[in-house]
Amino acid sequence: MKQEYKLKMLESEIRKVLSEALMEMKDPNIDPMKSLITISRVEVSKDKRYADVYVSVLGDEAKRKDVVNYFEQKKGYFRTYVAKNIRMYTAPELRFKEDKGIEATVRIGQLLDSIKESQKGDDNK
């Protein structure tokens, strides 16, 4: 139980540090999109060697893939930033992935809204 708690705290701290790194990053390719990018969650392996970083991006499919690929290219920068800001024996290897959970949540909300609208239309008849 204690080990799981420590792992969750580490995941939370890495997520916070990566968000800071993103905001401090000075790159003209990513600057216009910073407000559309969110580090939604981090999952660290039990041995703390790997961290799966889930990134959510508002925009179309191509933009989401471009951002995840960009993060993969810059993972050395992010890993160095994590190593400097979190006291660990070794910084975990970061693996960036697209978080589709937020997109699914928005889609479900849209479907529920359309159902409400159709029910209102049926009630008026």
UniProtKB/Swiss-Prot annotation:
Signal peptide: none annotated. One of its GO terms (cellular component) is cytosol. The keyword Transport does not apply. PROSITE patterns: RBFA. Keywords: Cytoplasm, Ribosome biogenesis. It comes from the Bacteria. GO terms for molecular function: ribosomal small subunit binding. The keyword Cytoplasm applies. It holds the Pfam family RBFA. It is found in: Cytoplasm. GO terms for biological process: maturation of SSU-rRNA. Its main location: cytoplasm. InterPro entries: KH_dom-like_a/b (IPR015946), RbfA (IPR000238), RbfA_dom_sf (IPR023799), Ribosome-bd_factorA_CS (IPR020053). One of several proteins that assist in the late maturation steps of the functional core of the 30S ribosomal subunit. Associates with free 30S ribosomal subunits (but not with 30S subunits that are part of 70S ribosomes or polysomes). Required for efficient processing of 16S rRNA. May interact with the 5'-terminal helix region of 16S rRNA. Belongs to the RbfA family. Monomer. Binds 30S ribosomal subunits, but not 50S ribosomal subunits or 70S ribosomes. This is Ribosome-binding factor A. It comes from Fervidobacterium nodosum (strain ATCC 35602 / DSM 5306 / Rt17-B1). The lineage of its organism: Bacteria, Thermotogati, Thermotogota, Thermotogae, Thermotogales. The gene is rbfA.
